[in-house]
Design a protein with these regions (language model features):
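Short, low-complexity, intrinsically disordered N-terminal peptides in bacterial proteins
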Residues: 1-2, 149
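Active-site-proximal alpha-helix that buttresses catalytic centers in soluble enzyme cores
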Residues: 2-82, 107-108, 117-129
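Glycine-rich phosphate-binding loop signature in dinucleotide/nucleotide-binding domains
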Residues: 40-43, 92-96
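Residue-level signal for well-ordered alpha-helical positions
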Residues: 61-62, 113-114, 135
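Short phosphate-binding loop-to-helix
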Residues: 76-95
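A glycine-rich beta-strand to alpha-helix segment
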Residues: 96-112
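Domain-level recognition of soluble alpha/beta enzyme cores
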Residues: 117-142, 146-148
Length: 149
């Protein structure tokens, strides 16, 4: 099973638009990353996002580029301040390849839990993608590759 952790693209500030959609530069960077992820073989069966507009827009681009037949849904446990253990527990029950479009500080903490490192040393790339794989139903994870904008 593979998991693709995707930090949403650059978003407008709340003073520009309180919904915080992706900026034009953010959309362009997300499109490039999605194309590159697809070229590396990213083909999730399910795409989850936090429900926030910027994460949804990011997830939609990856869904279009990587597997437009994938299940697509907003899901709980992906808000910036949610404990990452909740999502890790959910992933242990999954057998499908999953793409998660979410936020800092949640994604670096989830990544650190998955690979067993200190959050600060994990170095999750801002607005980037990290691909991980488990061969033992989510007990241990290894990083396959990462992409930065």
């Amino acid at each position: 099973m593979k998991v693709f952790l995707v930090h949403h693209g650059e978003a407008a500030g709340p003073d520009v638009d309180p919904r915080r959609p992706l900026t034009a530069a953010g959309r362009t960077a997300v499109e490039r990353l999605a194309i590159a992820a697809a070229a590396r073989g990213a083909k999730p069966v399910v795409v989850w996002h936090s429900g926030k507009l910027r994460a949804k827009q990011t997830a939609e681009e990856f869904w279009r580029r990587c597997n437009a037949l994938a299940e697509f849904a907003a899901t709980k446990d992906l808000q910036p301040d949610d404990p990452p253990q909740w999502m890790l527990h959910r992933l242990r029950g999954e057998t499908r390849d999953v793409l998660i479009a979410g936020h800092f500080h949640h994604l670096p903490r989830l990544h650190a839990l998955m690979v067993g490192t200190d959050e600060t040393s994990a170095g999750f790339p801002p607005h980037g993608v990290v691909a991980l794989e488990t061969l033992d139903e989510g007990q241990t994870w290894s990083e396959l590759w990462r992409l930065e904008p």
